């Protein structure tokens, strides 16, 4: 079967996401998406794009590179991230990222009353987070500091919004709200060969115009292809890690289960060993497979001329690991 050539970019790729939401000429698209996400809780009238690369303090010199970083008209800060692969300490990373817009609000000098502007960290997740605190039936999760006894909001100016777009499975006929339409576009734009009636709202005029690959310059096409290759490699590495992890977990579980079964009874031992072994083997196998595949992805991205900062952001590798690849 002949493969259909893509007409529109994938917003799941680093290039596609930043082209649509991270450039000043397209800020109306970002504003529209944010307002659909907030659904009246917060109204964004305008944004000013800020430098997405933030350097840590003199003690850590640790950098944070955001996909999109901008400021609202009232000084509120928005960090918007697209995440395609699960990371063990992803919650920690989101919290760490939020410290940068907090610290940069402190003026130079000694006089300051510590009043802070609102900070929103928005993470769009192309995977299921499997967070125990979340309602598994929901796609959007809103996190704030609250009193654990009263469940009342303790501090309302630091918010984390996680959107598990991997769970979004509505068809075009089922799209009801602007938020639905944005999630559909985020997940499925690259699959479309023509603009559907369900996405004929005026705000999407610019989306389809900016996303049409045929209008790209040769350089933009090369950058998109490199970004698409990195995205595919990441997804393939996840699939491989899952498969290897399951195989190793099954083998280890059977071995351990049989050994324990000799002592405690074959039926009980096999059942327990399989469960524990598969869980441990899956986790270790996925971690090992992901790390090896990420090194391969990084090597290809560097060979295609992508800068080190972007490679680290996409693959999760450290600067020292990249230096070893270059060496």
Short names for language-model regions:
Residues 1-221:
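Conserved single-residue anchors adjacent to enzymatic active/cofactor-binding motifs
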């Amino acid at each position: 079967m002949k493969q259909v050539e893509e007409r529109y970019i994938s917003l799941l790729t680093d290039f596609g996401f930043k082209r649509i939401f991270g450039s000043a000429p397209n800020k109306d698209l970002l504003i529209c998406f944010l307002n659909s996400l907030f659904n009246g809780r917060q109204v964004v009238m305008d944004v000013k794009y800020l430098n997405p690369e933030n350097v840590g303090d003199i003690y850590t010199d640790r950098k944070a590179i955001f996909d999109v970083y901008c400021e609202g008209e009232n000084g509120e800060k928005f960090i918007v991230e697209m995440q395609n692969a699960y990371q063990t300490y992803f919650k920690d990373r989101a919290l760490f990222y939020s410290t940068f817009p907090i610290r940069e609000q402190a003026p130079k000098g000694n006089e300051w009353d510590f009043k802070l502007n609102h900070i929103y960290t928005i993470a769009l997740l192309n995977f299921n987070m499997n967070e125990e605190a979340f309602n598994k039936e929901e796609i959007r999760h809103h996190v704030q500091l609250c009193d654990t006894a009263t469940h009342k909001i303790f501090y309302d100016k630091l918010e984390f919004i996680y959107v598990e777009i991997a769970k979004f499975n509505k068809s075009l006929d089922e799209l009801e709200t602007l938020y639905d339409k944005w999630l559909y576009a985020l997940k499925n734009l690259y699959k479309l060969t023509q603009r559907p009636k369900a996405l004929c709202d005026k705000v999407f005029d610019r989306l389809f115009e900016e996303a049409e690959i045929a209008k790209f310059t040769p350089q933009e096409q090369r950058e998109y292809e490199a970004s698409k290759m990195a995205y595919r490699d990441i997804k393939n590495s996840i699939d491989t890690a899952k498969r290897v992890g399951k195989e190793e977990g099954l083998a280890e579980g059977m071995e351990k289960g049989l050994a324990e079964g000799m002592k405690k009874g074959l039926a009980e031992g096999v059942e327990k060993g399989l469960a524990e072994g598969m869980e441990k083997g899956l986790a270790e196998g996925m971690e090992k497979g992901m790390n090896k595949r990420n090194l391969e992805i990084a090597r290809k991205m560097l060979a295609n001329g992508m800068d080190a900062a972007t490679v680290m952001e996409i693959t999760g590798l450290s600067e020292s690991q990249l230096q070893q690849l270059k060496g």
